[in-house]
Structures are given as C-alpha cells and as structure tokens.
From Swiss-Prot:
Keyword Transferase annotated: yes
Keyword Transferase attached: yes
Annotated pathway: Cofactor biosynthesis; riboflavin biosynthesis; riboflavin from 2-hydroxy-3-oxobutyl phosphate and 5-amino-6-(D-ribitylamino)uracil: step 1/2
InterPro entries: LS (IPR034964), LS/RS (IPR002180), LS/RS_sf (IPR036467)
Lineage: Bacteria, Pseudomonadati, Pseudomonadota, Gammaproteobacteria, Candidatus Pseudothioglobaceae
Gene: ribH
Protein known as: 6,7-dimethyl-8-ribityllumazine synthase
This enzyme's EC code(s): 2.5.1.78
Length: 167
C-alpha cells in the first residue's frame, strides 16, 4: 500500500490545523515574498487564516530557538501548533560565517521536527548571491515559501495517517 498526499483530494483534515510561520527579516523583502507564498498555499488548502500565526525574528540563526519554543507549547495536553514553516534567507558572503549559520539553522530546524514530532518545514534560502535568492523567492526558480509550506502540509497528512492508522 502506498501513502501519499493527494493534492486534489479531500483536505478537510486541515480545516482545524494550527500553523506557525517564522520569518527571518534580515532580508525583509525576501522574507515578505516567501511569507506571501506560504500564506497563499495555506489558504489554498483550507487552513483558516485565524489559525495561522506569523512570528518575525532578526535572522535565520534565531529561527530554531523560536521554533523549539513554539513546538513545546501545549494546549489541553496537545501540541498548540500542528505545523511550523521556517522562512528566510542566508546569502554567502566573504567569510565562513555563511557555513556556520546555514549548518546551525538547518540542524536546529530539523531537531525541532524530531524532538517534538511536529512537521517543521525548512523554507530558508541558502544561496551564493542575491540573484539566486530572488530567483527562489518568486523568480525564475519559483517560490520556496510555497514549496516548504507544501512539504509541511504533506507531512501533516502523513503524520495524521500514521497517528490514526486510517490508511
């Protein structure tokens, strides 16, 4: 038996989903484009705008800490958030700083998923220059805010299927 999210199927399971979006605003214009695509994707799949909270952090390095804090929050002994989308940009400069920030950010976001079993999508651009960044924030390479949000939605579906054993 195969288990895969049907993008054209019944998405009622998303109606009550609560999602946190964390945006690094070091590159505000890029963050805004990623956020817009993420919000459009959530709306397209029926997630109520009132169930979406957007949090802004100074940069990508700060995203994992807030993601961990949000993932740890409970309401009636249940996770407050069903999914988290991390958005931002890290652009390579002239120093090794890029490597450190990228590695720690990616590790931190993935650790949140593993520790709290909450789909936490990595929509943080790691690029060599601004042209590549713009290309991935709605330009010639699409919008990674949309793609990360879709990954989170698909994982929400699969996690629900595994939890309820409704295959």
């Amino acid at each position: 038996m195969k288990f895969k999210f049907n993008k054209n199927g019944n998405n009622n399971f998303l109606a009550k989903a609560k999602v946190a979006i964390i945006v690094g605003y070091f590159y505000q214009d890029i963050g805004d484009k990623l956020l817009s695509a993420a919000q459009e994707t959530l709306a397209k799949y029926g997630i109520n705008a009132n169930n979406i909270n957007v949090f802004y952090v100074p940069g990508a390095f700060e995203i994992p800490l807030l993601a961990k804090k949000l993932a740890s929050q409970k309401l009636s002994n249940k996770n407050l958030y069903d999914g988290i989308v991390a958005l931002g940009a890290i652009i390579n400069g002239e120093t090794p700083h890029f490597e450190f920030v990228c590695n720690e950010c990616a590790r931190g976001v993935s650790d949140v998923s593993y520790q709290y079993e909450i789909p936490t999508a990595f929509g943080i651009l790691t690029t060599n220059n601004m042209e590549q960044t713009i290309g991935r924030a709605g330009g010639y390479k699409g919008n990674k805010g949309e793609k990360a949000t879709m990954a989170m939605i698909e994982m929400l579906y699969l996690m629900q299927q595994v939890d309820t054993q409704t295959f």
